[in-house]
Curated annotation (Swiss-Prot):
Residues 48-91, 107-154, 180-226, 252-298 form the EGF-like domain. This is Exogastrula-inducing polypeptide. The EGIP peptides are factors effective to extrude the archenteron toward outside of embryos. May have a role in the induction of gastrulation. Its main location: secreted. It comes from Heliocidaris crassispina. Keywords: Cleavage on pair of basic residues, Developmental protein, Disulfide bond, EGF-like domain, Extracellular matrix, Gastrulation, Repeat, Secreted, Signal. One of its GO terms (biological process) is gastrulation. InterPro entries: EGF-like_dom.
Length: 325
């Protein structure tokens, strides 16, 4: 009798749990339905798809008229456009409107006029990607950037060019990567004997195989390893320096002053406006001084003005270690 009672209670308990789960599911569905109904009631619906398209100017070209749950037609906008306005059409949210409008123009003639023919350093072309799709925008020549204050093309600074070169190198590495260690060894002649195929754990090549070249060698056009030039070593030294500066940057002015003892009295903490340290505070050292290990300012050693090859290779190895982390 006791066993039967226990079984009865267990069955009843399971039924209650199932009923609660069913009830919860129904409540969730009802809530979603109410939210959808409320959203549709706040929009101006049309009886037909054609009526919706006419009244909303085809959703301003940034969406499609679709039928809602009550039979009315509404604009379904393409992100980041949203339904708004008295006619319930598609509009760019105010917070994203300004920067897009600076760059984009409705016609090629307007683009050329407003940007002074892209300042002579680019061409007005029809954009086919992202928020600017279907509008005209300056495509700037190499060495120039966009947008400036009116959407034209301004010269890139030397540091910007260095940074963009680094990004281009990252993309190049992605194209050199292979899906397997066998494919990597075969296609690169085992890294030309100056490296080895390893699985990448960083950046766009993560999970693929790429030649990890020995010190003094770099990936060549087909992904193998060729000797580095002196100029390439200088360039990577600069990249390593950027990494070092990033580790020295502080989030606030007081923190920068405190941690560096006011730049050791030989500089001042300023907000960085470029590269990885943008928006953070870092010591800008006086002439004849340079950032030390903790981010302050120490006198430059004249003997260090000409860095020897061994030092460059040390920086290169440090960079490789940073990228592997």
């Amino acid at each position: 009798m006791k066993v039967s009672l226990v079984l009865l209670i267990a069955v009843f308990g399971l039924a209650m749990v199932a009923a609660e789960e069913t009830l919860e599911s129904k409540l969730q569905m009802a809530l979603k339905s109410l939210l959808q109904e409320n959203e549709e009631l706040n929009l101006e619906g049309r009886d037909t798809k054609g009526g919706c398209e006419r009244a909303t100017n085809n959703c301003n070209g940034h969406g499609d008229c679709v039928q809602g749950r009550w039979g009315q037609y509404y604009c379904k906008c393409t992100l980041p456009y949203r339904v708004g306005g008295s006619e319930s059409s598609c509009y760019m949210p105010k917070d994203k409107e300004e920067d897009v409008e600076i760059e984009t123009k409705d016609t090629v003639a307007r683009c050329e006029r407003d940007t002074k023919n892209c300042d002579g350093h680019g061409t007005c072309q029809l954009s086919t990607f992202g928020r600017r799709t279907g509008q005209y925008i300056c495509f700037c020549d190499a060495g120039y950037r966009k947008p400036n204050s009116y959407g034209g093309c301004s010269p890139s600074s030397a540091r910007e060019l260095e940074y963009l070169s680094y990004v281009a190198r990252d993309v190049e590495m992605e194209m050199l990567a292979r899906d397997s260690v066998y494919q990597c060894n075969r296609d690169t002649n085992s890294c030309d004997g100056f490296g080895k195929c390893e699985k990448s754990t960083f950046g766009r090549t993560t999970g693929q195989y790429i030649c990890n070249c020995d010190d003094g060698y770099r990936n060549n056009a087909y992904g193998g390893c060729s000797p580095r030039t002196e100029r390439e070593i200088e360039y990577l030294s600069m990249i390593a320096r950027d990494q070092e500066l990033e580790m020295q940057a502080r989030d606030s002015l007081p923190q920068c002053n405190r941690d560096t003892n006011y730049c050791d009295g030989f500089g001042q903490c300023v907000k960085s406006t470029f590269g990885r340290t943008t928006g953070q505070y870092i010591c800008s050292c006086n002439d004849g001084y340079e950032n030390n290990l903790y981010g302050g300012c120490s006198p430059k050693d004249n003997e260090d003005e000409e860095v020897d090859t061994d030092r460059k290779m040390e920086i290169l190895r440090s960079l490789a270690n940073l990228l592997e982390e």
